[in-house]
Amino acid sequence: MFQGSMPALVTPMTNGAVDFEVLKRLVDWHVEEGSNGLVPVGTTGESPTLTHEEHEQVIETVVKAAGGRVPVIAGAGSNNTAEAMRHVQHAKDVGADATLVVTPYYNKPTQRGLIAHYEALAEVGIPIFIYNIPGRSVVDMTPETMGELAKHPMIIGVKDATADMARVSRQRETCGTDFVQMSAEDASALGFNAHGGVGCISVTANVAPKLCAEFQAAMGAGDYTEALAYQDRLMPLHNAIFTEPGLCGVKYAMSVLGLCSDEVRLPLVGVDESTKAAIEAALRHAGLLS
């Protein structure tokens, strides 16, 4: 159920407000283009600058628009366990298929604290993906800690943003081969799957969903020669999008293709002219812009 290419959805904005009509259109487009799932209100969905009400409205809108055609993994993390509990419960109540819960950031819990946090959330009764992103949260969940959490039937996988290929094999050892490992890094997704991953929660898939889905399908079929051809086609776009914060880059790329505006909320700002030029060149290289 959880595999392949899953866009880490942007949250479209118009004049400072979430544009729910555009969001619904994006959901339909992603399904039509072959995306294997949708992940709203993560980092790329501007979760830090959404109100609690907006957060819940975006999750509910995506679940309803998807209509069961693809699974929805709802962003539900917080560095406050009680707040995360509210998000996880809401995701369950509106019919999300799973939740994505980031390791608590800023307050730097110990590994024991991480275990207590996730075990408390797992009692809500909806599948949980751990989001391990030490570059943003500072704390790195160890494979051993993840293995302890994987014993809980509701903790089913990880979105891994470490870009450490050896980590995938180590987590297969500690968590078991059925534990669902999804890459959080577009540029290293090929290597991630080769080591035992089953997909990518992708930023680039916001603008190139068909290519990203075909890339993942090639790896799923064991055709890494074909997958490498897709990698070569997409790599300049991965790099250009992440020249500045990825959600800013991918929103600009989407605006070039007429999918949504490039508007982001402060403290983020739109990309500069040199980044715009690099993104446009990369879109041409990928065959997405003439």
Swiss-Prot record:
Site (Part of a proton relay during catalysis): 43, 106
Keywords, comma-separated and alphabetical: Amino-acid biosynthesis, Cytoplasm, Diaminopimelate biosynthesis, Lyase, Lysine biosynthesis, Schiff base
Keyword Signal among record annotations: no
Pathway noted in the entry: Amino-acid biosynthesis; L-lysine biosynthesis via DAP pathway; (S)-tetrahydrodipicolinate from L-aspartate: step 3/4
Entry annotation: catalytic residues: 131 (proton donor/acceptor), 159 (schiff-base intermediate with substrate)
Biological process per Gene Ontology, one example term: diaminopimelate biosynthetic process
EC number: 4.3.3.7
Family according to the record: Belongs to the DapA family.
Protein name: 4-hydroxy-tetrahydrodipicolinate synthase
Species assigned in the record: Jannaschia sp. (strain CCS1)
